[in-house]
A protein has these predicted regions:
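A short helix->loop->beta-strand "cap" motif at the edges of active sites that frequently abuts
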Residues: 133-135, 197-199, 264-272
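Short glycine-rich anion-binding loops that position phosphate/pyrophosphate groups of nucleotides
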Residues: 111-113, 176-178, 239-243
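Positively charged, low-complexity intrinsically disordered leader regions
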Residues: 1-51, 55
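Phosphate/diphosphate ligand-binding glycine-rich loop within oxidoreductases
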Residues: 31-39, 47-158
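Phosphate-coordination loops involved in phosphoryl transfer and adenosine-cofactor binding
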Residues: 32-38, 166-169, 268
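Rossmann-like adenosine-cofactor binding region
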Residues: 215-274
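Glycine-rich phosphate/diphosphate-binding loop of Rossmann-like nucleotide-binding domains
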Residues: 43-65, 158-238
Length: 274
């Protein structure tokens, strides 16, 4: 089984319940990964995802190997049929097969370039390893998804949701940022919320900052941030760059910054952020 999207799992509620049990006794399954190796390949930097994934593997008794392709390893070519006479030193076909020989699971982190939308949404790096690797692939944040983060968010909401409400209200709110940021975290949060049958979900952002319509299909969109925050139990705040004017910062309105006054509109809501 590959884990590329939160929708790859068979039951979100079952996975969340299992994760909460594991948190209470993280070394309970320390022999599960005996004689198995996790290979972690980083095409972009990481702090929390790297540490938490590596720690989880060690808790399961796995060996862990890490490669940072920013300053280690060869530059890879991902286009099939490409003539290897330019900057790339090795083709993904051979690289994925080699890594598969030494690893039982391959975890990959490769961000969006935020220049070519079509290329990013084709998930060039992840797709290349999926095609040629012979072992399971885990997504540690790709061009358009971050399913480990969204699973962790689902766990947090289960732990802190109000028990007196049948359907807690969750808001995903855009907020300004000086840099152009990927849509991966927001996309995966939306996909996770689409699996939550017992929660109300609203996305709020400035007009023109819609996420991919394929991702947000059937979601409630509210362009009035204050209205969206009313009676919310969770407010998840994240910036993402423009999807239509791809990768651009077309709005930096400070009025979209989340403040204590805005949180006062919520139902004593929990503030979440990645």
């Amino acid at each position: 089984m590959n884990y590329i999207s939160i929708k790859d799992i068979d039951s979100l509620s079952k996975w969340v319940k299992s994760a909460i049990k594991i948190k209470k006794d993280p070394l309970k399954n320390k022999k599960l990964g005996k004689n198995k190796t996790l290979g972690m390949l980083f095409f972009n930097p990481s702090l929390r995802t790297r540490l938490s994934t590596q720690k989880a593997a060690l808790n399961l008794g796995m060996n862990v190997m890490v490669m940072n392709f920013t300053n280690e390893g060869w530059t890879l070519e991902f286009e099939d049929g490409a003539v290897m006479n330019s900057g790339a030193s090795e083709h993904i076909k051979e690289a994925a097969e080699v890594v598969s020989q030494y690893c039982d699971i391959i975890a990959i982190r490769a961000f969006a370039g935020l220049v070519d939308k079509e290329k990013d949404y084709q998930e060039t790096v992840i797709s290349g390893f999926l095609k040629y690797a012979t072992v399971p692939i885990v997504n540690m944040e790709s061009a358009i998804r971050h399913p480990l983060q969204s699973l962790a968010d689902a766990i947090t909401m289960e732990e802190f949701k109000p028990r007196h409400k049948d359907k807690p209200k969750v808001v995903l709110s855009w907020a300004p940022h000086p840099k152009a940021l990927p849509q991966a975290v927001a996309n995966s949060f939306v996909e996770m919320m689409q699996l939550q049958k017992d929660m109300d979900f609203v996305i709020t952002h400035p007009e023109g900052y819609e996420l991919s319509p394929e991702i947000t299909k059937d979601c409630t969109i509210e362009y009035d941030q204050n209205k969206a925050f009313e009676n919310a139990d969770f407010v998840y705040v994240k910036n993402w760059s423009n999807f239509n004017d791809y990768g651009k910062v077309t709005n930096s309105d400070p009025n979209w910054t989340v403040t204590a006054e805005k949180m006062a509109l919520t139902n004593n809501g929990k503030f979440m952020h990645c």
